[in-house]
Amino acid sequence: NRFPEGKSESYGQLMDAATGRVLLQDGGFLTTAKWMPKSNRLYYTRTGLDGTELVTVDPSTYQQTVLVPNLPKGRFVFTPDESTLLYTVEEEGPKEGTNLIRVLEPADRIPGFRDRSFIWRYDLKTGLYEQLTFGHTDTYINDISADSRYLLFSTSDRVYTSLPHSRNSLYKLDLQTMAIDTIWEKAPYV
């Protein structure tokens, strides 16, 4: 909704798809809530007493349950079996000295160029939070298998001596054994 003087208001609605009836209208959690991958529940995060809470909502009863009272920071997705959260965590890259700055490539002049994103896993049953990827390139979550066993993730490198400049790699990680299978590596323009 738009109000005078540029003010605005946002809200979310939960509707019964069969009847079109609005079950719940909310300007709070519904604006950020997402559906769980398997169960018929919504989830969202909020600030709690111990930190960020992961909360689930049963839309039929509106009952809210705190699934995790102190959630790690970062962007996450649920695995399809709803037992694990896979995070993308941004880490600050190395800093150069103030007297002499070594520019690795033209984009190195952009603030945050050396920052990297890595994939972490948070087990909802045990609370174990572990880093799955590391290195000098960003890693991106591409997909998770329906049985939640395999993670497809990718990396991207820049090569300025040939066109196209980017080289992409795609890997399959077995989340039980931690074995990696290379789908393709350093493929130009995929």
Locate each region found by the language model.
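Blade-terminus and WD-like Trp-Asp/Gly-His loop motifs, strongest in beta-propeller folds
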Residues: 1, 33-41, 76-84, 142-150
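A flexible loop/linker signature enriched in serine peptidases of the S9 family
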Residues: 1-13, 26-30, 45-55, 69-73, ...
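Short loop/turn segments that connect beta-strands within beta-propeller blades
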Residues: 16-20, 58-62, 123-127, 174-178
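A short beta-strand motif characteristic of beta-propeller blades
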Residues: 20-25, 63-68, 128-133, 179-184
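Extended amphipathic secondary-structure runs
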Residues: 38, 122-152
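Ser/Thr-centric signal marking residues that sit
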Residues: 79, 84, 88, 126, ...
